[in-house]
Regions:
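A short, well-structured beta->alpha microelement
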Residues: 438-457
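Hydrophobic targeting/anchoring helices
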Residues: 205, 244-435, 522-527, 534-543, ...
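Short, well-ordered coil/turn segments that N-cap beta-strands
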Residues: 1-3, 29-31, 62-68, 138-143, ...
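Polysaccharide-binding and catalytic clefts of secreted carbohydrate-active enzymes
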Residues: 92-294
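Short, acidic/polar
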Residues: 12-27, 125-127, 131, 257-271, ...
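Aromatic-lined substrate-binding rim segments of carbohydrate-active enzymes
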Residues: 19-27, 31-100, 130-133, 229-237
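The substrate-binding groove and active-site-proximal loops of carbohydrate-active enzymes
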Residues: 3-14, 36-52, 106-126, 160, ...
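A conserved amphipathic helix/loop scaffold
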Residues: 459, 467-699
Length: 699
């Protein structure tokens, strides 16, 4: 386990601070520093590479017994790039040449710079990565590489990019591979092109979906490929140290906007196939991210990593500042909870942004872990405690593996592409996923995220939730049908699979659910803001957009939960050896907004129906709208380790462990306070050890 901090974004902090800062970093319980190795700074003159400042920083780190993470910032390009590679500028969707400029938070270098589909630009970039690897791969205290920071490539492009000839050529090659040639594309798109060169990418939303969705998909794949190419350059030099990359958020939270496509920085699941690990940035206080959202955020990254390394690559160090505004306080206790939340999800490296307050541009006077917001002493004291505990209990934490889940939530990028093709925004789709995830986090029901192209291993799951999954293709429908036929449970919302990846609408009888005798009658206007579901109790749930009742079918429902004008609106159906829970509207989005506890009760009942029974249950206190007990667990060399996150220091929780997990009278040690807890009939009474949380280990 490594706990560190970002330090240097050239040329700041200035060299007069380095010696004392690195000593203070070590004294604060941190063991790693991250340095931004900027292409523009290192190669300010073509083919001359100056690493003098990095050499000195790395030497100071070694003297202070600090490991080093090197972040290759190749996306901040040299000022000479367009002079040495003429015509390398990106082109926007209107045909305009993109004028690069200094990035808002970086003092030297151009962004977005030249298009990396231009071979000459890529070779220049690859040379920088290669030179950096050759210089530092042999360091004894190198912890690893962050090969691509926040997966940035189009920042400050000021419009949709890139439509340069090189990228358009790559798009045509990609289409050729996707569809097996022009005939396959014409058949799928229902067009009559005479050559691939005539196929134009989608230009703007609210126009035909087909080419717009394909173009967005290509842009995602383009970023995936670029990450793989960066990684390959470094791996050719360094096969010892991990090569990771991180996004500004998990890929499922890139919803797009009017000047950027959703998931345009790559798909974490695809990135993890070639990298050694995946990370993301998180600024919880600045972004209003509470425990539930932070928990699902880290779970997204862990799920995508698929057993590879999980890094929290940028975590908020101090108070945020943008321009002449400051935002809230970063106090010690919540910051420590971010660390332990990451650990509970299996993160092995956590890096804070940053050590000192920034001094450049819009971020001036912000973000410093040791910054001058009045709270640095408490933050550093808390960090020292955590660093010491991680060192003392390294045998436990270094071998910790999170427990597995029996529930999966499906993330479908094609949903985002369709939504953006119409609305220039994939927010509906992201919120739907996060609504269901939040309901599970608040009940401490383990779950994972699934991605639409990674559904080959579903045997360990009992329940798969498909939030707003309006786009499904053959691969997904085949895997999901096999899952339910073999005994799994699917929870689906309205118009599941109503579109294919080409953006054509399917009639209800042609959709995924029709094979199980579940056929929607069509969209009906909302008459109320919610419906009552009748299970073993009546639950009023909020809904939105429309309702889609079902036609009568030979597959009669096992249970009818709700009706609309005499037609089934929500029900349980038998399907092979499994079952399908059909909901004829959208429930996750309004729950995320209104936090109706009845939705949580419904999800818990569906989980039980699917055969899911969490091995650890929170007996008390019951969650309120804003407060809840959050539990994560796993094992370290066979020993159970359980993390509890409390709403307050004065809270006491009763936690029940299943007999399969622990004997009914087992003893646990709370590692922060060294308190020994004896289970009574499998129930532990637990108080926070520190930071409104507890870490329990088998005694």
């Amino acid at each position: 386990m490594n706990l560190g901090v970002q330090y240097y974004r050239a040329p700041f902090p200035e060299s007069k601070y380095w010696e004392n800062d690195f000593k203070a970093i070590k004294e604060a319980g941190l063991d790693t520093v991250q340095l931004w190795v900027l292409w523009a700074w290192v190669e300010s003159k073509p083919d001359f590479f100056n690493y003098d400042d990095y050499d000195r920083l790395i030497e100071i780190a070694a003297r202070n017994k600090l490991k080093v993470v090197l972040s290759t910032i190749a996306e901040i390009q040299p000022h000479w790039i367009h002079r040495i590679v003429p015509g390398s500028e990106m082109i926007d969707h209107l045909g305009n040449k993109v004028i690069s400029s200094l990035r808002c938070e970086c003092n030297f270098g151009l962004t977005p710079g030249g298009c990396t589909d231009n071979p000459a630009v890529w070779e220049r970039m690859a040379q920088f990565i290669r030179k950096t690897g050759e210089r530092y791969a042999g360091l004894g205290h190198l912890h690893g590489w962050d090969i691509w920071n926040e997966l940035r490539w189009n920042v400050q492009a000021d419009n949709l990019v890139c439509f340069c000839p090189h990228t358009i050529q790559e798009f045509h090659l990609w289409l050729d591979q996707q569809y097996g040639g022009l005939d396959g594309l014409n058949a799928a798109w229902k067009r009559r092109y005479v050559c691939l060169e005539d196929v134009a990418p989608g230009k703007l939303p609210d126009r035909p979906y087909t080419e717009m969705m394909a173009w967005q998909h290509f842009i995602t794949e383009r970023a995936n490929r670029h990450a793989a190419r960066r990684c390959a350059v470094m791996k050719a030099i360094d096969q010892v140290h991990p090569v990771t990359a991180h996004g500004g958020c998990p890929s499922a939270d890139y919803r797009g906007w009017d000047k950027g496509y959703p998931i345009d920085r790559g798909n974490d699941w695809a990135l993890a196939e070639t990298l050694d690990g995946i990370g993301c940035s998180s600024f919880p206080q600045w972004g209003g991210i509470d425990d539930a959202e932070f928990g699902s955020r880290v779970e997204m990254v862990k799920s995508a990593a698929n057993g590879k390394r999980v890094w929290l690559s940028e975590v908020q160090g101090g108070r945020a500042a943008v321009g002449f505004n400051i935002y809230g306080k970063v106090e010690a206790a919540p910051q420590q909870r971010w660390i332990w939340n990451g650990l509970a999800c299996g993160a092995d490296t956590i890096l804070f942004w940053c050590w000192r307050d920034e001094v450049f541009g819009r971020e001036s006077a912000g973000f410093g872990l040791a910054g001058r917001d009045g709270l640095a002493p408490q933050r550093l004291e808390a960090m020292k405690f955590t660093g010491k505990l991680l060192a003392e209990k390294a045998e436990i934490f270094n071998h910790y593996i999170p427990g597995s889940a029996e529930i999966g939530i499906l993330f479908t990028p094609q949903n985002y592409y369709l939504a953006w093709a119409q609305e220039a925004d994939g927010k509906r789709m992201g919120d739907a996923i996060n609504g269901y995830a939040r309901s599970l986090v608040r009940q401490s029901i383990p779950y994972c995220f699934l991605e639409e192209q990674h559904l080959d291993d579903l045997q360990h799951l009992k329940l798969i939730i498909l939030p707003r999954s309006i786009v499904l293709n053959d691969y997904q429908t085949e895997r999901l049908a096999a899952f339910v036929q073999n005994g799994g449970t699917l929870l689906v919302e309205s118009e599941c699979g109503a579109f294919g990846r080409e953006g054509f609408y399917r009639y209800p009888e042609d959709r995924f659910l029709a094979q199980f005798g579940i056929v929607e009658a069509g969209r009906r206007n909302l008459e109320t803001a919610g419906i009552t579901l009748k299970l073993d109790e009546e639950l009023f749930l909020d809904i939105e957009q429309w309702v889609t009742p079902l036609e009568e079918s030979v597959n009669a429902p096992v249970q009818v939960f709700s009706t609309f004008n005499g037609q089934v609106l929500a029900a349980e159906f038998k399907a092979g050896q499994g079952r399908i829970i059909y909901l004829g509207s959208y429930f996750g989005n309004p729950y995320l907004e209104k936090r109706n506890p009845n939705f949580e009760s419904f999800i818990q009942k569906v989980s039980v129906l699917a055969g899911v029974k969490p091995a650890i249950e929170v007996i008390s206190p019951a969650p309120s709208r804003d407060e809840f007990i959050y539990v994560k667990s796993g094992r370290s060399k066979g020993r159970l380790v359980t993390y509890l996150f409390f709403p307050g220091d004065d809270c006491t929780a009763k936690i029940k462990f299943s007999p399969e997990l622990l004997p009914g009278s087992a003893k646990l040690t709370e590692l922060m306070s060294n308190q020994v807890i004896t289970l009574i009939d499998g129930i532990a009474t637990v108080k926070p050890g520190r930071f409104k949380m507890a870490v329990l280990s088998e005694a």
